[in-house]
Amino acid sequence: MAGLSSINNRQREMSEARGAERKEIWLRDGDQVFLRPVATGEDDDPNLEELYLYTYEAEGGGWKNALVDPDTHKPMSDDVPEGKSPSHKFAMWAYVSEVIHNQQRRDDWEEVVSPSGKKAYREEVNDFRIITLPFGRGNQYWNMLVDQYDDWGSLNKGVLRVKRTGAGLDTVYSLSPVARKVDVPSGREGEIEALQPIWDYYVSRYGGNDSSEETETEVITATVTPTNEKVEDMSWNTSDEDDDEDF
């Protein structure tokens, strides 16, 4: 008969296996991620996609996501509750160096201190991940990305910091270019061509009744963002003290 330790180890292995299949980054309150987009922003770029996604409670607890078919404008899952509205999102591949957390939720995260003395916890990623964000009120966040494309000429020419503040109805995001070195290692540049197109990834994850189950795990796996989150009143370059912290 398995003891507590064996059961705990088994559950962790199962959770890590599920996490390895997922490639999205979902930020929690206070998290910030540093990344270099792999997407270029050019027409027909498979590494950047527009999505409509339902998020709703599943039977028996937990959450589910269901992708909207762009041809029929209907969810690809038949159990979406009546009266639900999908969230308008965009997703892109990026090379992520690290995620900075304001709370330590894992022992292997490194404690770091900013010049002002603020503590945070660094999660090393150094891998390709998908970052998904809402378009925002009046396409606010999307327009931030477009502005950066106009400045750089291509999205993959620089490094972005994406930060989430708040939760639920009080959730806001900020996106800003930063002078930080985040480069795809020369030995991994060939992997970019092999990345699964964003749309295909989302269809495989959230395109049917059996593929859309969600559980709340660590930031590089999944956390549900409410469909009615607050997305207004955040400028391109924020002046919040937390945004200015250099870790």
Q: PLM ranges: what are they?
A:
Residues 1-151, 207-215, 221, 241-247:
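OB-fold ssDNA-binding interfaces and closely related basic DNA-contact patches used
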Residues 232-241:
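Short linear regulatory motifs embedded in intrinsically disordered, acidic Ser/Thr-rich regions
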